[in-house]
């Protein structure tokens, strides 16, 4: 299995605001076999910003995109996130098995 990661940088929202929504999104993603990780920058010019990494099987990329688009829990979480955070960047990377 080849794993793909989507790495996103977000700006906005406090820990108290972001955490409950992130927990909901993580649970919704897990139903689709997507791994979700949230981190907060603690140094540098992005202090206080968020780094989100989601990982999934590359072969399932298109299928997962369609499933997420139809998943009400995911769409609700995306709408909530948009109220307090702005996505600064998003990159898709292929994970290498070394």
Question: Would you name each region that the model predicts?
Answer:
Residues 1-6, 94-98:
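Short flexible/disordered coil segments
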Residues 14-16, 60-62, 98:
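Residue-level signal for secondary-structure boundary sites
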Residues 9-20:
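Short, surface-exposed ligand-recognition loops at beta-strand->loop->(often short) alpha-helix junctions
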Residues 12, 56-58, 94-96:
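Non-catalytic surface loops within mature trypsin-like serine protease
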Residues 20-37, 55-91:
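An amphipathic, aromatic/His-enriched active-site/gating alpha helix that lines ligand/cofactor pockets
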Residues 43-46, 91-98:
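Long, low-complexity, Ser/Thr/Gly/Pro-rich intrinsically disordered segments that act as flexible linkers
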Residues 51, 82, 97-98:
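Solvent-exposed, flexible loop/coil residues
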Residues 2-9, 37-69:
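Short, well-ordered beta-strand segments in beta-rich or mixed alpha/beta enzyme
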């Amino acid at each position: 299995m080849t794993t793909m990661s989507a790495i996103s940088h977000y700006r906005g929202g406090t820990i108290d605001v972001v955490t409950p929504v992130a927990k909901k999104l993580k649970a919704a993603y897990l139903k689709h076999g997507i791994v979700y990780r949230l981190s907060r920058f603690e140094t540098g010019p992005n202090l206080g910003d968020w780094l989100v990494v989601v990982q999934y099987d590359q072969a399932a990329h298109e299928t997962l995109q369609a499933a997420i688009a139809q998943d009400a829990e995911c769409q609700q979480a995306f709408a909530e996130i948009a109220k307090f955070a702005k996505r600064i960047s998003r990159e898709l990377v292929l994970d290498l098995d070394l």
